[in-house]
Amino acid sequence: MQHTLTPEEVGAKIVEWYSCIISASYEQAILLKEEARHAVMHMQTNDKILAYYSLVEFRHNIFVDEFNKKHELGDTFEFVETEVDRYLKYLYYFISGQYEYTQERYRSAIKMFRKAERLLEHVNDDAEESEFYLYIGLVYYRLNQYLLASSYLEQAETIFNRLSYYERALNCKQVLGAIRSELHEFETGDAILKEAFRESTFPRTSALILRTLGLSKLRQKEYEAAKTYFYQALEYEEHRSHQIGMKTRYDLSNTLFKLGQDDEALELFQQAKAEANQYNNKEYKARCLYLDGLYIAKDHALVDQAINDLYELSLLYEVCELAEEMVELADQRNDDSTSLKYYRIAYKAKVNQNKLGADQV
């Protein structure tokens, strides 16, 4: 049975093909055209990637024709950039950034998106522009650059609303609410999220908002409320049967462990752990390792490995969150040395997450 490819996987293949056209690698371009064509045939439906494929195919045909003419005359072929190429170059960086984002390589993604941003003037479509603002906002959010993330997401939300793309606008609002919660502005964050939920008529987005409200309540240590929101999110098939459902099962398991409901928590944990491995989700594989060390194996070496794995993924907010929880648990036991150890980890993560390094611009 043929595996269905994601748009991001196919986009990455088309990017590789276009790179060969730019570098005038004739034989490699011919080969990759066939690989890209085969990939498109087995892709989940995505109009943007199909349009990108068509544009690159158009540019490929011009390239091949010009290359052959030059070859016949014994001349050297030189790639001459056109207006189409400037738009294709934008798509090259944008789709590369999307792919890096799906692979959880957020610093690489932001490099691609910043290059795409310099070519936005060649994009004459409001919908495409708003999609760019959404994605770059999401990556800055994952890198804990909340001011930049909010700025881009607010721009995207405004354009989406103007275009009547209401679900996309609500996606922006949901992340803006999450940002306020992560900044411990809980009243404002929860109000934004509840307003978004009232406005939503889209099952997938409604479930995502409920999950975000659950995470906010978890931060506030309102565990019963968090539990309710997570269960409500999992009532939606669109949420339950996808990768995001795995994340919610993990968070629900974490909440239930905190409530002392260990049997139910363990069952959900085992399911979430298996799914995290199935999806190869690096963040949640690390998070599952953390829960295992904290509640099941009761082994701080696993906790330390989990925190280190998150640090290597540049998920500094998550490092800070878990380290601060370890500080709190150590303080409850009057274990000053352990408390100091995790306080230092949390402090280092907090300092670093507020820095915008050279590799992020």
Q: Each PLM stretch: what is its role?
A:
Residues 1-96, 269, 299, 305-361:
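Flexible inter-repeat linkers and adjacent short helices
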Residues 5-9, 45-50, 84-91, 124-131, ...:
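Alpha-solenoid helical repeat architecture
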Residues 13-23, 54-65, 90-104, 131-142, ...:
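Tandem amphipathic alpha-helical repeat scaffolds
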Residues 21-37, 63-76, 104-115, 145-155, ...:
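Helix-turn-helix repeat elements of alpha-solenoid scaffolds
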Residues 34-41, 74-82, 114-125, 154-165, ...:
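Amphipathic alpha-helical segments of tetratricopeptide repeats
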Residues 56-151:
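Long, mid-chain structured domain cores
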Residues 146, 150-216:
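Loop-centered beta-sheet repeat module
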Residues 252, 257-322:
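Structured C-terminal portions of repeat-based eukaryotic scaffold domains
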